[in-house]
Amino acid sequence: MLPKVHRLWHPQDFKTVYARGVHRKTSHLTLRALRCSPQFDRIPDGNRGERATRIGISISQKVSKRAVVRNRIKRQIRAAFRQLLPKLSNGWDIVIVVKPTALECNYAEFLQELEQLLVQAEVIHEYSGGNNI
């Protein structure tokens, strides 16, 4: 589970990211990211400053009719994000849209694709090539 401060869950927030955010694609995932205006909310280390980056995952029944399968994919993506959290810049709202081809992916592939998408969207600035597992 992602820390509460890093969760994007209001439907209006998802709509805003879809409407105004940039998008990047790989074969299994689509990333939509929106840089938020600077606000003085708490960030995870307790200091005042930019709002923490918030992450939402969207996976439709087109990916799988079985909720068990969809939830497993979401857990793998959340685990990959937990590993990438220290590298993320503050002040972003991110939505990951899962494509039906993601059924073939394992954790390492999700981690590599997420890192690649985040670098393309300039949410993180270094790319390790997936060697950080």
Question: Language-model features: where?
Answer:
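Positively charged, solvent-exposed patches that mediate nucleic-acid binding
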Residues: 1-133
